[in-house]
């Protein structure tokens, strides 16, 4: 529905003015004004600027998390805080809280003020000492998890810089996990980059075809690829049923958080559940998200 102004160009490509264009949803309704529209989504949104029921009307049917677990369609999601294991300063904790509140007020839109806080927080979260602590803790924690149930894990970082540096730190401790070969190695970074990002980040750049290859490896429980580090990639629409652990070191909430944690709730053999490991203090955001998407109140 959103209208936006774009450049109006002539046949030669010269800009001759501005024009307003609308989204596909508005054109559909203009073309079929008497049609009934039904929306299907796993994560409806109810913010002031984006509201699923406001567009499609009241819910016809709700199949929530609690029902899915009861039916055996998904496994339970468990939470573990590892905040005490890593060093996030008082300033960092304050920034997380302020950013959280800012995003609440602005319905998850990023103003300049919110971006400034994000940049400040990224510097604290991505400090050399903290990355070393997280790398060491993830290795120990994941190996312990693997000894109980062999599966896959995903690490969510708040920036590409942190993702790249976390990878380097992990393979410093576990050099045998590294491989330059896309088809080998225990851990990979999944992201895109541009030439301006510098060599440390751009060496992790993947094409669409390469990401498809990595996805197949991650979905194969027999493949040696066990851990991936992402910023935004694979947090929606990616299914690897054997994935049992999600390490979160990025401010997340609402439908974005709900979509992310669903990476570990797939049924696989005798997998007892999916585990969310929190390094940033998102417990209240997780509880709110689970409450919103579950009639059982997030239990």
Say what each PLM segment does.
Residues 117-230:
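Conserved C-terminal RecA-like helicase domain
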Residues 49-150, 167-171:
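Interdomain helical connector at the RecA1-RecA2 junction of SF1/SF2 helicase-like NTPases
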Residues 1-2, 42-47, 83-87, 160-162, ...:
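Conserved nucleotide-binding/hydrolysis micro-motifs of P-loop NTPases
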Residues 80, 224, 257-296:
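Conserved segment of the helicase C-terminal RecA-like domain
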Residues 1-39:
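SF2 helicase catalytic motif II
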């Amino acid at each position: 529905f959103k209208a936006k102004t774009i450049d109006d160009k002539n046949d030669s490509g010269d800009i001759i003015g501005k024009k307003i264009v609308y989204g596909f949803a508005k054109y559909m309704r203009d073309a079929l004004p008497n049609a009934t529209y039904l929306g299907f989504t796993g994560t409806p949104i109810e913010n002031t600027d984006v509201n699923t029921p406001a567009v499609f009307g009241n819910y016809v049917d709700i199949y929530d998390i609690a029902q899915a677990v009861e039916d055996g369609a998904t496994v339970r999601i468990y939470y573990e805080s590892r905040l005490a294991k890593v060093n996030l300063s008082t300033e960092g904790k304050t920034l997380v809280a302020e950013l959280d509140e800012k995003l609440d007020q602005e319905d998850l839109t990023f103003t300049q003020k919110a971006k400034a806080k994000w940049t400040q927080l990224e510097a604290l979260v991505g400090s050399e000492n903290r990355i070393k602590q997280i790398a060491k803790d993830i290795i120990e924690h994941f190996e312990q998890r693997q000894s109980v149930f062999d599966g896959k894990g995903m690490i969510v970082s708040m920036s590409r810089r942190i993702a790249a540096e976390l990878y380097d730190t992990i393979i410093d401790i576990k050099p045998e996990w590294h491989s330059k070969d896309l088809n080998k190695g225990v851990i990979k970074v999944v992201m895109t980059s541009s030439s301006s990002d510098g060599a440390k980040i751009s060496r992790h750049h993947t094409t669409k075809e390469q990401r498809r290859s990595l996805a197949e490896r991650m979905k194969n429980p027999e493949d040696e690829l066990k851990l991936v580090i992402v910023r935004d990639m694979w947090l929606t629409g990616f299914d690897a049923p054997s994935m049992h652990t999600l390490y979160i070191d990025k401010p997340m909430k609402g439908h974005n958080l709900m979509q992310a944690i669903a990476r570990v709730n797939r049924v696989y053999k005798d997998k007892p559940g999916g585990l969310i490991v929190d390094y940033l203090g998102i417990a209240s955001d997780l509880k709110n998200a689970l409450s919103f998407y579950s009639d059982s109140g997030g239990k």
